[in-house]
């Protein structure tokens, strides 16, 4: 194998789309001091500019409650102000995911995660719209129109995982996609009523789903749509929405008698075995193939991936997770306009906090603020020059990407030997 590069050959500008945003645990954790210390470190060392999280309207944020006597609603944005003030202080901005419901607006008992985010459609759509309008009015008053115009507003999170995806008593949205479109429409119109320049988008789906349907709905019904947002993980090709065995599992689990411990354990073990072998069907570079399709479906709209990672459990904490990032980001340049890694930290209590430092969590940093191998990959990518050579070298599982940093007149070679799990690597 011989690698040669003409340093005078064609280059193209590097758009640092992977640094535009990063994901985090739900909103209330952004009030923690350790969360803030870690996010400040990530902004400084990795260059992240926005942060996205679930649950901005959850009860643990104390945003909205209803008087049991008068039947009137009361609002407080104090905790949100506390978080947004902090973000601006460290040079970051919020990528505002509008979720979940305050419990006073719930139309059922469905919740998600350890912190019980309410995932039902609102029982009072007018009250939801009033909440959105009041929220936007407050942001304008506190931060100014020019500042809020730099933010993004995304309606909900993964509405196709829940009622539409076969999981009636769980998931992120207990309604159908038709219900979601109605929620999106009323929310987007309320945002544009506050300021036409405010940017709103969706459908925030898992597995690149419903992009065409979202565009079609918005065009047909004259609903504002400034960007497409979706998510993808490599195992989506086997586990994602629309895969029959996944849907059947969710359906079977939701209908299972939870008092029958033997049946519950048997189904759980079956699923664990399925997950253990899943990577046999996940090919190298699968996220790039997904992104190519999504880019085409998004048309002329900006394409934001507001969640992605290797999602490989313990291997994600080590060299596999690092090489996955180092290959995926260069390969997806020009396909996505934003690529928000999920998440910056293992300060993540969706199922309660972890007990071990390295446990295969989503974060780039451990709960104790120790950098994992994927963190170092982002550090390395942050140091790349502002130009990329168009010529790419690929040999079996080895890829070489060439960059140029004109500030010090250097050429940088990023060499990545990456292979999907349960597949052979060329050495």
Per-region residue spans from a language model:
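Mature N-terminal, pre-catalytic/accessory segment of carbohydrate-active enzymes
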Residues: 1-49, 54
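Alpha-helical scaffolding within the catalytic cores
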Residues: 1-9, 33-39, 75-82, 139-142, ...
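Conserved residues at the C-terminal ends of beta-strands
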Residues: 24, 54, 156, 231, ...
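Short, solvent-exposed loop/turn elements at domain surfaces
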Residues: 28-32, 61-62, 238, 422-423
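Substrate-binding cleft and catalytic face of glycoside hydrolase catalytic domains
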Residues: 46-279, 299
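Generic beta-strand/beta-sheet core signal
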Residues: 54, 203, 230-231, 306, ...
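Catalytic-core region of carbohydrate-active enzymes that cleave or remodel glycosidic bonds
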Residues: 223, 227, 263-353, 357-360, ...
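Carbohydrate-binding surface patches
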Residues: 397-427
């Amino acid at each position: 194998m011989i690698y040669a590069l003409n340093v005078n050959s064609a280059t193209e500008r590097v758009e640092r789309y992977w640094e535009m945003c990063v994901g985090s645990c739900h909103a209330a954790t952004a009030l923690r001091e350790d969360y803030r210390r870690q996010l400040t470190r990530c902004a400084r060392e990795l260059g992240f500019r926005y942060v996205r999280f679930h649950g901005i309207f959850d009860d643990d944020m104390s945003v909205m409650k209803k008087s049991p006597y008068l039947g009137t609603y009361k609002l407080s944005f104090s905790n949100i102000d506390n978080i947004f003030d902090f973000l601006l202080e460290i040079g970051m901005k919020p990528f505002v995911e509008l979720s979940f419901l305050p419990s006073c607006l719930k139309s059922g008992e469905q919740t998600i995660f350890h912190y019980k985010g309410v995932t039902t459609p609102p029982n009072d759509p007018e009250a939801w719209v009033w909440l959105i309008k009041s929220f936007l009015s407050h942001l304008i008053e506190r931060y100014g129109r020019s500042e809020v115009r730099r933010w993004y507003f995304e309606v909900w999170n993964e509405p196709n995982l829940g009622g539409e995806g076969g999981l009636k008593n769980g998931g992120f949205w207990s309604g159908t996609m038709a219900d979601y479109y109605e929620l999106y429409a009323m929310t987007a119109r309320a945002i544009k009523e506050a300021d036409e320049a405010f940017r709103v988008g969706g459908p925030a789906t898992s597995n690149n789903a419903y992009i065409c349907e979202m565009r079609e709905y918005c065009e047909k019904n004259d609903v504002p749509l400034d960007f497409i947002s979706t998510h993808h993980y490599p195992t989506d090709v086997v586990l994602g929405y629309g895969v029959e065995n996944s849907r059947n599992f969710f359906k079977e689990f939701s209908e299972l008698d939870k008092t029958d411990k033997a049946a519950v354990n048997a189904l759980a073990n079956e699923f664990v075995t399925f997950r253990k072998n899943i990577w046999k069907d996940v090919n190298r570079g699968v996220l790039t193939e997904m992104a190519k399709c999504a880019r085409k479906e998004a048309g002329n709209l900006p394409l934001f991936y507001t969640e992605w990672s290797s999602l490989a459990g313990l291997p994600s904490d080590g060299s596999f997770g690092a090489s996955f990032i180092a290959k995926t980001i260069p390969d997806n340049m020009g396909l996505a306009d934003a690529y928000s890694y999920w998440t910056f930290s293992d300060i993540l209590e969706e199922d309660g906090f972890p007990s071990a430092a390295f446990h295969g969590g989503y974060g780039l940093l451990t709960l104790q603020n120790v950098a994992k191998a994927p963190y170092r990959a982002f550090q390395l990518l942050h140091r790349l020059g502002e130009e990329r050579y168009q010529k790419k070298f690929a040999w079996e599982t080895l890829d070489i990407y060439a960059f140029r940093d004109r500030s010090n007149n250097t050429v940088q070679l990023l060499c990545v030997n990456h292979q999907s799990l349960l597949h052979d690597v060329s050495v």
